[in-house]
Amino acid sequence: MKQVFVDLRPWDKELAIAALESGAAGVIADSAGPVRELGRILVIAPDGDLIPGQDIHEITIGNTEDQARAMEAARTCRIIVHTPDWTIIPLENLVACGDNVIAVVSDIKEAEQALTVLEKGVSGVLVKTDDPDLVRSICRMVQSGISGQQLHRLTVTTVKPAGMGERVCVDTCSLMVDGEGMLVGNTSSGFFLVHAETLVNPYVAPRPFRVNAGGVHAYLQVPEGKTAYLADLKAGDRVMIVHGNGSCREATVGRVKIERRPLFLVEAESECQKVSIILQNAETIRLVRPDNSAVSVTSLKPGDVVLGRVESGGRHFGMAIDETIIEK
């Protein structure tokens, strides 16, 4: 996920509070002390978590020589880029060189452009403003998933009982809405969008903070393009909440429940690539249709179309790698 940093030079308590309350990734300040008094957040400062000029470098681009210097630095270290005459061209060149670029922005339009340049965008933005509401707006925009997820239509081919086993409920510290859930799959190259427990039913009250995600072995997509095993999740971990329209946001795990339950195997295809998932056999477990509505696994049948994500390559310790790996 993209990150938002806030410039607190000179010191501005209201901006610092806005950064903390909005979930900004960090701040840059002349001293870490005043920030620490308000709360815990990553601080870029001479006495902070990241030291300017050592862990991170600030570069002002005023000419082609500055741009060349920034492009070289972006290949090996994290840089904060100031562009007095803000245009998108220097950022395109920098983004093409690496994932270490934080762009200084002063309004929401600049932030949106920086985060989407070359479709990839910079890794983060440093908000330079005296308006706490602008900080909140940019944080909301980033957390709502400005880049989103490309979802695919999966045609169901098989739905059948899969015996008993341990399944995982992921309880987050966020409330999800209809159409939202998590991307989960049996393999690292195929995921189903498993719907959150937001719907009213005769059996149990809604649990909009929960996704009954599947077997302990399954992969879950988490931030930064990585995956995690459901069995490895714990309180405090960060996960991705994905909507059927492709938008996504991060959430914090509050609790993980692993219980033995009857299971279903669901198999599907997308452009000749097979994907599968093992879910609990219960009416309250749902996948997401292309119209963002939910369909229970107990009423799912071959030919039904649901949403998911299909990828190529494999995974090593959750990181995507360009390697031939056979999973089935």
Swiss-Prot record:
UniProt keyword terms in alphabetical order: Amino-acid biosynthesis, Aromatic amino acid biosynthesis, NAD, Oxidoreductase
Record's keyword annotation contains Amino-acid biosynthesis: yes
Pfam families documented for this protein: DHQS
GO molecular function annotation: 3-dehydroquinate synthase activity; dehydroquinate synthase activity; NAD binding
EC number: 1.4.1.24
Function of the molecule: Catalyzes the oxidative deamination and cyclization of 2-amino-3,7-dideoxy-D-threo-hept-6-ulosonic acid (ADH) to yield 3-dehydroquinate (DHQ), which is fed into the canonical shikimic pathway of aromatic amino acid biosynthesis.
HAMAP family documented for this protein: Arch_DHQ_synthase (MF_01244)
The protein's name in its UniProt record: 3-dehydroquinate synthase
